[in-house]
Every structure is written in structure tokens, then in C-alpha cells.
């Protein structure tokens, strides 16, 4: 009886091993830093940080004697996002007060992020989170529906020029803090049929997020 040795066996085994390694490494469900980073970046790419906690509608009117109401709008006038006009408003039968009327400029309309749920409402958004590091994650599995708590650091990407202006940052302290440097955040990720996705995003002191 002649026995034929399979000289290609080690080579075949090596190929199978490499294929398995690549399949695991490229699997979106794999529990690794790259997939967590991608999930968080994808979520915040569609949920930028904005000036106001709730969408607002222009035009708006503010009493000129109340700088807490006018300073923010005036800073946006300086950046060309709003136009300002003055008027007198009747306060009592024989009295009146000076008010400023603010409305979107052409530049402001192009920078405006409209609210899809409230026609006419919107916000000025100034960037989105870009993960710089995944600091920790709780143990999880590759099963669909599994969750993990992720702690990470990020910086705001794609900030427009108006957001970097000193007047704007003075009028909006949260904007200044967001653009000052790296921030820390936390998120709950859920393993879905399409890979890891953000399911809960606890506040970490960052800017208002458009949902």
C-alpha cells in the first residue's frame, strides 16, 4: 500500500487560520476599540453640539436694558449670522421701552440647522464629537443585544469660524468650554445586527446635542 503524504497540509491550515483571523478582525460586532470609536463617531456625526438647549425660532425680540438677553444675540450679529434692528415697544399707555429685533441674515440661514420636528425652529450648531481615545469599557459579549458602558475622550471637530470668535465664546460659556480642549464622555453601546450602536448617551458637560 502506498501512502500519499499531503505536503500542502501546513499551508492549507495556515490559510484557514489567516481567514479566521481576518473574519474576526473585520467583524463589526467584535469587541474592540475601533468598533466602539466608529459607533460613537457615527452617532455624534448626526447629533452636533449647538448653542441653545432647545430649538428657537427667529425673529426674536429682547429688551435693550437686559444684557443677559441681548449679549448672545449681539455676538451673533457681530459674526454676521443675525441682523439687528431697534424699535420702541409700548409698555404702558404713556410709556414705552427700547427693544432689539433679531432675525437671521443670509449667512445665518446658510449656517442654520433646521429642526425637522418643528417647522421654523432650529439652532446654530458648532461641531460634533470626534473620539480621540477609548479609555475603558465594561465586559460584554458578541451576542446581539449585548451592551457595554464605554468611557472615552473626544474633541469637537469641524467648528466653524464664528464659533471660534472671542465675542461668541464670551457670550456662550459652554461653547468656549467645548472648544477649549479634550473632553471626557460616556456612552452605552448596544450590539445590533448592524454592529455596535450608541443607545444611551449620559451628559458629560458638553454642549447641547441636536436629537
Label every PLM stretch briefly.
Residues 2-14:
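Bacterial N-terminal signal peptides that target proteins for export
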Residues 85-125:
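Accessory beta->alpha helical hairpin/"wing" motif in late/C-terminal subdomains of nucleic-acid enzymes
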Residues 22-25:
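C-terminal motif of bacterial Sec signal peptides marking the signal peptidase cleavage site
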Residues 68-83, 87-88:
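Basic amphipathic alpha-helical segments that dock to polyanions
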Residues 27-32:
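Bacterial lipoprotein signal-peptidase II cleavage site
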Residues 83, 149-161, 177-211:
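Short beta-strand edge/turn micro-motifs at domain boundaries
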Residues 42-75:
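Post-signal-peptide N-terminal segment of Sec-exported extracytoplasmic proteins
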Residues 106-121, 159-181:
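Mixed-charge, low-complexity intrinsically disordered segments
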